[in-house]
């Protein structure tokens, strides 16, 4: 990787979370986020001038709350066509594909991954995603995979 990453785009379910949808007796939904991922997003990315963004196919108040907590202003929920949103973000931040990293876990992410210069995925991503990823985390989604990818991005840029 020789170009500077300016934008990290993340999927939620299966990437920032373990992909499970836990439901309470009254239909309330619970999601678990890894604190290490949060530190990487909230502290490490800004320190290196990298903008975090979330594009997810589902809509959830929980995700909105977590994004706010991590100061993620680029939150796009309910996006089944993630590519249009990705292209808008690239235009907004004046990024070429080489300036964009993407981490996701499933086939809906592949169309975006093919447009990014650096692609990562959790250890438990589907096979098609692992085949095109430049970085496969040792961690599963929701268990620090995003933090590992952030550390990889930063280390790669420091070595360049």
Where on the chain are the PLM-derived regions?
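Mg2+-dependent phosphoryl-transfer enzymes with acidic/Ser/Thr/Gly-rich catalytic loops
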Residues: 27-31, 69, 83-160
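Alpha-helical substrate-recognition element adjacent to the catalytic core
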Residues: 1-81
């Amino acid at each position: 990787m020789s170009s500077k990453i300016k934008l990290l785009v993340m999927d939620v379910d299966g990437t920032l979370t373990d992909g499970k949808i836990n439901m309470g007796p009254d239909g309330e939904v619970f999601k678990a986020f890894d604190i290490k991922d949060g530190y990487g997003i909230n502290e490490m990315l800004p320190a290196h001038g990298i903008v975090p963004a979330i594009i997810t196919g589902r809509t959830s108040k929980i995700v909105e709350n977590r994004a706010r907590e991590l100061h993620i202003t680029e939150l796009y929920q309910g996006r089944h066509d993630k590519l249009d949103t990705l292209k808008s973000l690239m235009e907004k931040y004046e990024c070429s594909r080489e300036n964009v990293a993407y981490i996701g876990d499933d086939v809906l992410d592949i169309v975006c991954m093919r447009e990014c210069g650096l692609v990562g995925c959790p250890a438990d991503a589907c096979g098609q995603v692992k085949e095109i990823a430049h970085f496969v985390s040792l961690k599963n989604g929701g268990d620090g995979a995003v933090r590992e990818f952030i550390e990889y991005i930063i280390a790669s840029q420091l070595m360049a």
